[in-house]
Amino acid sequence: MTDRDALWAAILANPDDDLPRLVYADWLDENGSGLPSPDRESAADRAAAIRSQIEYARAEPFSPVARIAAEQTQRLVNTHRQEWGGHLREFAETFEFVRGFIGHVTIEAARSAQVLPAVFETDPIQAIRILRPAARDVWVSLEAVFEAVELRQVTTLELPFADMGATVEFEAMTDSPHLGGLTSLSLSGNPIPPEWLTEFLIGPDLPALTALDLSDNPHLGPAVTAGLVQAGHRHFTRLDLSGIIIRSEELKRILGSDAISGVEELCLRWGGWPNPGPLTLLDLGWVLPWDRLRLLDLDGHGLGPDGVLELLRKPATENLRWLGLARNGLGAEGVRLLAASGRLNLYYLDVRQNSLSPRDVERLRKRFPDAVIEW
């Protein structure tokens, strides 16, 4: 085994550890000139990509430092994508680099038995997205996917719009002996059985889970409420309930639940816009779980300037770095309130579809010079 092979093996064996990745970057700098083409020509760029993505992962989320590191990495990856990831094109629909190496892949459920062993053998993959065609003539059960032993190193599982509606598939997922280390789960856009969701949240399955995406499931309001208020054993740091029809009294109970008391990223995009969202009936400053909140998306609630004022009264808003206020009827007065706030220190602000003028946007840019302003 060559030194390069040994370093790569160490990365595969310790996917959470940055040290082997940084050692590999150093090795590329020192030995890249002796590699065969085309690795020789791209060795310095590969080392730089590893370091910049690790810098991104360690930086304060959404900060200018993180953005610069991400942009630098993207330029390098775009230049060398085929060279660094071409070996997976036969197996993966898409792939993404994480901390300098391919760490996220998208595969088709129908090919999982052939694809999973191949992709996990060559790269430190910890995140996987499963695609399943909706056409019934090519229907593929996901039960076999959840039996794959390769999933034991997966921490992020994404099943967006996979047409999962059968309880048996959800039970196969939660009963899988290979998903015990799962920390992030996306079930966005699936016809999730409400009874299953409530029982899952209350129950012991997937105990390491800290991030859950249930977005674009309008029917889940009562089920997610019943589950979260009884899920004191869970500790979510990221929760996406966007597009779920939730009544104000239900949302108040969710926001006060122990399960999300330490949430850092909370997405509550309202799917009933232009009708006002449930947050318009609540005191924003007091119902939101502020302790660790750094990302808050309130898209579509129609809060207006009064809602912005309620939001800004809470001192803990100083912890926010990402704020989504699209489709909230802010107008010039809402902009004035945001600009006058002495607490906010934002790196991202979404104010799309708020009837703002270029002057309003310029005022926000002046107030938040380090922020990306979407309008």
What is the role of each PLM region?
Residues 2-95:
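Extended, charge-rich alpha-helical interface modules
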Residues 89-93, 98-102, 110-119, 121-129, 137-147, 149-156, 166-175, 177-184, ...:
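Leucine-rich repeat
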Residues 65-175, 179-184, 188-189, 262-282, ...:
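LRR N-terminal entry segment and analogous cap-like coil->beta motifs
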Residues 104-115, 128-138, 156-165, 184-192, ...:
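Concave beta-strand-loop units of leucine-rich repeat
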